[in-house]
Amino acid sequence: MANYFNTLNLRQQLAQLGKCRFMAREEFADEAGYLKGKKVVIVGCGAQGLNQGLNMRDSGLDVAYALRKEAIDEKRPSWRKATENGFKVGTYEDLIPQADLVVNLTPDKQHTSVVRAVQPLMKDGAALGYSHGFNIVEVGEQVRKDITVVMVAPKCPGTEVREEYKRGFGVPTLIAVHPENDPKGEGMAIAKAWAAATGGHRAGVLESSFVAEVKSDLMGEQTILCGMLQAGSLLCFDKLVAEGTDPAYAEKLIQFGWETITEALKQGGITLMMDRLSNPAKLRAYALSEQLKGIMAPLFQKHMDDIISGAFSGGMMADWAEDDVKLLNWREETGKSAFENAPQFEGKISEQEYFDHGVLMVAMVKAGVELAFETMVDAGIIEESAYYESLHELPLIANTIARKRLYEMNVVISDTAEYGNYLFANAAVPLLKEFMTTLQAGDLGKSVAGTSVDNAQLRDVNEAVRNHPIESVGRKLRGYMTDMKRIAVAG
């Protein structure tokens, strides 16, 4: 199979990369109505599979789970989760032929085998759903022409999808219809109903494309969302310990610092995050972030280029064919890092101390978010999509580090995200080694000394932060998410 994106001409590529429209709430007046009375069968019962299914059932849809026969016979975790929650469970052969919508929520690397197994069983005119378009765009999966192919991609982990729904809210969501598979013109109606059934319409839905979702999702998770947090954690911990900081304190400052810092980001963007610093610290964080952007821009651009060309997906799929030898080696190396094995700090670190002693971490977040956003937009991705794949998801990923350090982050994210994370972090750490030697007292582990501030410089920095394009689009999109809750687990 050929990479679908690479079969398109330039005009088609640009059109699909640039497809992005914020949908009005009135467009979801029928909510999940289009799918009521129809049979929805979910393949896969992981975090997204289970939690989307629970939401859809609570929205009045008929939901069942199709699992492999061996998973049922051996009563594997997927079978237990589905049955313990009262869902009907059956084999592919039992359930797929009656399904009006088959939702594939298995891991990326299983998509090809799953889709090839279910396609022959699907009835004429049924629909096939994804929550990530990798199989369609990067693998180039060919789907029967009578089948409608749609995507509903919540911009949060599965657990958050469920928790927000139970609060009567939802999470921001991208929806799309594959242009090669919409024979009856009902793809958008199906996608809208599915998104509403998960609660996404209450938080904001972007009409996107499979191409835009995949290329932006890969870029975000590889760079700022996971790769930058991993590289930053390793670099900052080693720097603190090398300068005599108690390893336990250093570990806690970093483990919970990302979450505390990005909670401000979630509530008020980069502007609020920077406003949590003293004026001297803000000026220093801005200067550091500009240095970081200059150093890292080529690395961000290389990742975007490799994602657009298909070089990234080709390399990762080659590793799949070798039983994940690279992925597993990188995972083992991360587990052996000093940060992952540092003792726990029993003392208290106040919320403000995370900012005061984490000026470099604030700078890393600012630089990473802006670079990811700018690089995606330069590649033709619309600003709203770039926002969701950079700034919006960052607090959720930081929250996983607060739970069990980098191990937890890499367990929670997909194997695709984990592979890309290691690629980026393994390049970023040596790239930033020299920069780390230039840090001043007060950049990390201590507060910035001095109180002198140049008014004109502070004015210019404030204006530069607030006028960055990601802040403009962020203010608009956060307006649709006013019911957000704090996700901090607090250290």
Swiss-Prot record:
What processes does the entry annotate via GO biological process terms? isoleucine biosynthetic process; L-valine biosynthetic process
The residues that hold Mg(2+) 2 are: D217, E389, E393
- Enzyme Commission number(s) from the entry: 1.1.1.86
Any idea which GO molecular function terms this record carries? ketol-acid reductoisomerase activity; magnesium ion binding
* Residues involved in NADP(+) binding: C45, G46, A47, Q48, R68, R76, S78, D108, K109, Q110, G158
- Keywords, ordered alphabetically: Amino-acid biosynthesis, Branched-chain amino acid biosynthesis, Magnesium, Metal-binding, NADP, Oxidoreductase, Repeat
Q: Which Gene3D superfamilies match?
A: N-(1-d-carboxylethyl)-l-norvaline Dehydrogenase, domain 2, NAD(P)-binding Rossmann-like Domain
Primary enzyme class? oxidoreductase
The record's GO CC annotations read: cytosol
- Tell me the ranges covered by the KARI N-terminal Rossmann domain, including all copies: 15-208
- Residues recorded as binding Mg(2+) 1, renumbered to this chain, are D217, E221
Which InterPro entries does this UniProt record tie to the protein? 6-PGluconate_DH-like_C_sf, 6PGD_dom2, KARI, KARI_C, KARI_N, NAD(P)-bd_dom_sf
Q: Could you name the active-site residues?
A: H132
Question: Which reaction(s) are listed as its catalytic activity?
Answer: (2R)-2,3-dihydroxy-3-methylbutanoate + NADP(+) = (2S)-2-acetolactate + NADPH + H(+); (2R,3R)-2,3-dihydroxy-3-methylpentanoate + NADP(+) = (S)-2-ethyl-2-hydroxy-3-oxobutanoate + NADPH + H(+)
Cofactor names from the entry are:
Mg(2+)
Its family remark reads: Belongs to the ketol-acid reductoisomerase family.
The record ties this protein, via NCBIfam families, to: ilvC (TIGR00465), PRK05225.1 (NF003557)
**What is the designated name of this protein?**
Ketol-acid reductoisomerase (NADP(+))
What species is this protein from? Answer: Serratia proteamaculans (strain 568)
Q: Which gene encodes it?
A: ilvC
